[in-house]
């Protein structure tokens, strides 16, 4: 890529863990296999949205490493390049990803991999904010975190000593951005899938990836006995 071409693109990074290492809070409702199947479906959805945005290279940042067969499938089917998240807490890994991306492109967007409502247009709206001169763009999550962060510059203050996984992540990130005197935009809030009650909001096509067809028999756990469906109709 030439220098002029690099200036026109925004890298989109998707953070994901290997199936079986994510969405463990859904196991009581879905079973181990069901939770892994839903996780795969959500990751593919987010990578596909990144690809369809046509903003620039799509990078799948993988944990614990890039060797899981599912990640290799994403690379083969969707054209995402694979990158190891590496060591450290979530903030350290995000900072590392942004430093890598912004060394190659003037703008970068990072999203999670459990966002059913993520769309190519949402990503394009994020990049539009950065192209018009914002230093940061945030896609809030309904639970007090965020589903997306986009940057045109990187500062470690955004990522260090953040209470990741708590309800104050977004508020603390806003404070950090204000302290840096950065210009920032917030997009409409989206929801992510963390708890069994979130399953009720999934589109039907995503439910089909991990739930049996509606046959009146109900969901069953891995021993074949009926299990609680976590409120799903």
Language model features: what each stretch is:
Residues 71-107, 166-169:
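Short phosphate-binding loop-to-helix
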Residues 26-34:
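Short glycine-enriched, charge-decorated loop/helix-capping segments at active-site entrances
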Residues 5, 168-233:
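Conserved alpha/beta core of the MobA/IspD/sugar-nucleotide pyrophosphorylase nucleotidyltransferase superfamily
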Residues 39-56:
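A short, N-terminal amphipathic alpha-helix
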Residues 111:
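Catalytic metal- and UDP-sugar-binding loop of GT-A-like glycosyltransferases, i.e.
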Residues 1-26:
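N-terminal nucleotide-binding beta1-loop-alpha1 segment
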Residues 118-143:
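Conserved donor-nucleotide/metal-binding helix-loop-beta segment in metal-dependent transferases, i.e.
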């Amino acid at each position: 890529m030439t220098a002029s071409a690099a200036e026109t693109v925004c890298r989109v990074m998707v953070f994901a863990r290997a199936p079986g290492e994510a969405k463990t809070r859904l196991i009581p409702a879905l079973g181990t296999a069901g939770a892994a199947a839903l996780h795969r479906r959500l990751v593919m959805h987010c990578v596909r949205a990144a690809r369809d945005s046509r903003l620039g290279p799509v990078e799948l940042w993988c944990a614990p490493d890039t060797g899981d067969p599912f990640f290799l499938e994403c690379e083969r089917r969707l054209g995402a390049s694979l990158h190891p998240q590496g060591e450290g807490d979530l903030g350290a890994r995000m900072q590392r990803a942004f430093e890598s991306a912004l060394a190659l492109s003037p703008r970068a967007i990072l999203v999670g991999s459990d966002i059913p409502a993520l769309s190519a247009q949402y990503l394009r709206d994020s990049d539009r904010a950065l192209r018009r001169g914002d230093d940061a763009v945030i896609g809030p999550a309904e639970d007090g975190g965020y589903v997306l962060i986009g940057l045109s510059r990187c500062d470690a203050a955004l990522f260090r000593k953040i209470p990741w996984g708590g309800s104050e992540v977004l508020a603390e990130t806003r404070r950090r951005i204000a302290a840096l005197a950065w210009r920032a935009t917030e997009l409409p809030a989206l929801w992510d899938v963390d708890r069994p009650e979130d399953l009720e909001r999934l589109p039907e096509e995503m439910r089909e990836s991990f739930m049996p067809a509606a046959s009146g028999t109900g969901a069953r756990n891995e021993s074949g006995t009926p299990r609680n469906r976590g409120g799903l109709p």
